[in-house]
Each structure stands twice: as C-alpha cells, then as structure tokens.
Amino acid sequence: VDYNTINVKISAGVHYKITDKLEASINTYFGSGTTVYTGADRYSLKNLKMAQHKFELKHKNWFVRAYTTQENAGDSYNSSALGAFLNEAYRPSSAWFPLYIGTFSEGRRLNGAAASDFTLHSAARASADAGRLIPGTARFDSAASIIKSTPIRRGGALFLDKSDLYAAEGQFNLSDMIGISDKLEIMVGTGWKQWAMNSQGTIFADTAQTIRVNEYGGYLQLKKKLGEAVTLTASGRYDKQTNFDGKFTPRVSAVFKVARENFLRVSYQTAYRFPTNQNQYISLVTGSGVLMGCLPEFQDYYKLNSTLPGYTAASVVSYRAGSIADSSRLVRAQYNEVKPETVRSYEVGYKGIIGKKLMVDGYVYYSEYKDFLVGVAVAQSRAGNKFELYSPFSSTNVSYTQNSADKVKSIGWGLGLEYNAVKKYVVYANVFSDQLRDV
C-alpha cells in the first residue's frame, strides 16, 4: 500500500455579463490524487480522478444552473482483499490448514509431551508456509500486480467505479418580479438529480447495467416583516426519490427585536434523510464479511429471508459462549423495509451587542429523530446449518442499513462571544455541547 498522499486540483471558469443584471458562467473543476481510506476494510485510493462541470445563469432575482460530477476510481483497490488473495495465491486455505494440522498432529504423535505446543506450532507453520510469497521478491510483486488489476467480482481487489451525477436546479424571487418585496418576500425553487452508479459489480449491484437513481423536489418560502419588531418566515419543501415515497418538510421561524441590536429567535424545523446510494445498492465482499444494500431485493439475493437466514449479533455471541448443541440461543434477525429518516427540531437563540463592544450569540436546541438509519450486523451460516454459526470460520458476517425502532434524541447548546478589547484587537471565545441519546 502506498501511504503517501498526493492531491492535485485544477479549476477554470469563464464569466460573461450579458446585461447589467444577468451573468452567464461556465466552470470546470478537476481533481486527482492518491491516499489510503479505512472503513470496513482498508482501501488504497490510487490515481483517483474527479471532475465537475457547471453552467449557470445568474440574475438579481433568480438563477438556474446545471452541473455534472464525473468520477473514476483509477487504480484503487481493497488492500485487505489483496492480502487475503496473496495468501491464497501460493497455497489455498483448503491445502494450508490440513498441512498445518497434519504436521502439528504428527509432531505430537512422535514426540508426545516432550514437545511444547509452541515448538509444534512453529514446525507446523514452517511446513505450511513453505513457498510463501515474500514481499520485495519478483514472485510477490507479480502476484500482487495481477490481483490489483483484477476486478473484485472476478476474484481480485480492483475497484472499477466510474459513477456520475447529473443535476439541475433553479431559484426565483417572485417578490421582486411582481413588485411586492416591500410587503412579502416569496422565494420558490426546484431541483433534480440523477446518480448513475457504474462500478461493474465491484462496489454496487450493477453487474448487469448502470443503476440510475432520480431525486426531484421543490420548495416555497414566505417571509413577512411585522414592523421593525418581528420577522416571520415559513417554508416547505417536497422531495421524491426513485425507491422511496415523497417527503414534505415544513419549517417556521420568528425573530423578535427585543432591544436595539438585540434579537431573540425561535424556530421549528423538520427535515429528512433518504438512505444513501451506498446504503441502498452496495454489494461488497470484504475481509470481514459482506456489505449489502438495504432494499428488499438484497434479502432475496443473499437468501436471508429463505434458506440462509441471518441471526442477531448479540444472540450469536451468546451462542458461541455456550454449547454448540444449544442453538436455541440464536435469534433470527427481522428485516423491515427501510424508510427515510426524519427529524423534528426546536431551537431558541439570542444574538445581540452589549455595551457596543461585546457581541453574544447563543442557542439551545432539541431534536427528535424517527426511523433513524443505523447499521445492522447479522451472522449467516454458509450452508443453512445453524451449528455453523458456532464458528466464525463457517459463517459470514453481513451488514446492512435498517431503521431504529427507538426515537433518537439530540440535545445541545452553544455560546459564542466576540469582544472588541482595544483598537484593532478582537477576542473570540466559544463553547458548545451536543448529546445524542437513545441511539
């Protein structure tokens, strides 16, 4: 693995003023690099490339833009898989373990108690490891090169990710356009995105064809001033994604002027989070198990709801702590169709200037999540026999996303201070606290 980090970024743009109020622009951004990422496994992101191209028309009262993001995994590979396949390259596990066990057992038979377990283990390892690939040798480098250049779905470690994003969005200030900005501010907007996942089966379940996921939505915001003392804002947006029902999320807020340069704010907000594309479509075998999508079809593909059911991690740990015959400890994992995560949040805040020198900005909030998205780990036997779960060598760890049955809560507060001490010198201080409960 190359642990050096290289990052190259290039950008270019052309901006043209069509009129005094209308500007057109085209911008291009390109990045390339090499680094190491650690998640479920360790990944060598080598010669990774990413580009974004954007076209925009911008007016005082509106804008429309379209952009695309293109990515290429380059020569990236799963280093954990590389290590495992290198071990298999010189002698498969099906041959290594019998040779190790045979040598250890024969040593015990010939020497009895005169030979320690460590001595027998060393002899067995020496026998089973004979001919093992040694780093720095031509044989090792040749085998590693072949595995690095072979896609994961063909028994190698290479990622083939050339996924793209296409998007268009616009926003319009209707108040100025219809001449009522002094009475009511009206803002509307809309947007569309399409993700095109193309990993050729090395990350996502897209072996047959590119997976396309569409998301679209729109929003409306109204803002009204009641004299100089109160400003009210109300907004709502609707979003829909390919695999999930649409979500409507309203928000309201009020700002009160309690004194000159002193304001109190209160708000109620709702928001949502669709499962990510990775949550939905990943299909990746790692050194520690299988990462699979949360959509119902993955339960069918991996036979979790039929001949190879999954069992909860806690029950498997309990089973392995007892007798192999006591499979009654095992609890079958229940899969529920995943929903978007939603949150309701309440906030009270204050911002003001005290004594013309001290600016204070503080807030407290409370949030409650419903259908919180969490990772679930289950164990699956390899041949449908419960007793296989007693050993990690005859079972498979499987992980996917589910909604939590509990309501997760978040509570927090923050305080920021800015003090003009003497001419040209400003002192800043801030403190905050955030707690996530019932996760």
Enumerate the language-model features and the residues they cover.
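Outer-membrane beta-barrel translocator domains and adjoining extracellular loop/strand segments
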Residues: 31, 36-43, 68-70, 75-83, ...
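Face-selective signature of the C-terminal outer-membrane beta-barrel domain
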Residues: 54-244, 361, 428
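Outer-membrane beta-barrel channels and translocator barrels
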Residues: 19-21, 31, 59-62, 175-181, ...
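Surface-exposed extracellular loop regions of Gram-negative outer-membrane beta-barrel proteins
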Residues: 7-51, 186-195, 209-257, 417-435
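Transmembrane beta-barrel architecture of outer-membrane proteins
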Residues: 5-11, 48-52, 163-171, 213-219, ...
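Membrane-embedded beta-barrel scaffold of Gram-negative outer-membrane proteins
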Residues: 297-396
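Gram-negative outer-membrane beta-barrel transporters
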Residues: 28, 360-439
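Transmembrane beta-strands of outer-membrane beta-barrel pores
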Residues: 28-34, 59-61, 68-72, 192-198, ...
